[in-house]
Amino acid sequence: MKVIFLKDVKGKGKKGEVKNVPDGYANNFLLKQGLAAEATNSSMKTLEAQKRKEEKDAAAEVENAKELKETLEKLTVEVKAKSGEGGRLFGSITSKQIVDAMQKSHKIKLDKRKFEMDDAIRALGYTNVTVKLHPQVTATVKVHVSEQ
């Protein structure tokens, strides 16, 4: 019997896959548990439409990330901090502080976990920080740390 998997089934198939499985296995387990649906013409058309919609949504997500990247790369985020002699900061600037500064000055809200910083910023001046907006889109934000 041909079935469309509605959920991942270990050793049998992944969600959205169409496979031939034994009739008894399909009727007694997959269909009863709601793990699969019988592959009829209408359900195949529904599956195709769903796949097209998911691809369209994914493409739109990448486009939005690219637009945000262009916006972010034009910006300079100003962060003020207390510093000692030689331009060393008392403490450091973390991704959370950068996100807060962006929210205040540019009204752009990002998740602090998207910032890829090896270490926190510990000196005055300009620093480039990478932001992973999407698995395929990475932006660079210019952060200017000035004395308070």
Swiss-Prot record:
Gene3D superfamilies listed in its UniProt record: Ribosomal protein L9, C-terminal domain (3.10.430.100), Ribosomal protein L9, N-terminal domain (3.40.5.10)
Q: Name one GO molecular function term.
A: structural constituent of ribosome
According to its UniProt entry, one GO biological process term is:
translation
The organism sits in which domain of life? Bacteria
UniProt keyword annotations, A-Z: Ribonucleoprotein, Ribosomal protein, RNA-binding, rRNA-binding
Query: What InterPro entries does the annotation carry?
Result: Ribosomal_bL9, Ribosomal_bL9/RNase_H1_N, Ribosomal_bL9_bac/chp, Ribosomal_bL9_C, Ribosomal_bL9_C_sf, Ribosomal_bL9_N, Ribosomal_bL9_N_sf
Gene Ontology CC entries for this record: ribonucleoprotein complex; ribosome
Q: Which family does it belong to?
A: Belongs to the bacterial ribosomal protein bL9 family.
> Which NCBIfam families does the record cross-reference, listed alphabetically?
L9
* Function, in words: Binds to the 23S rRNA.
Q: What is this protein called?
A: Large ribosomal subunit protein bL9
Q: Which organism is it from?
A: Bacillus cereus (strain G9842)
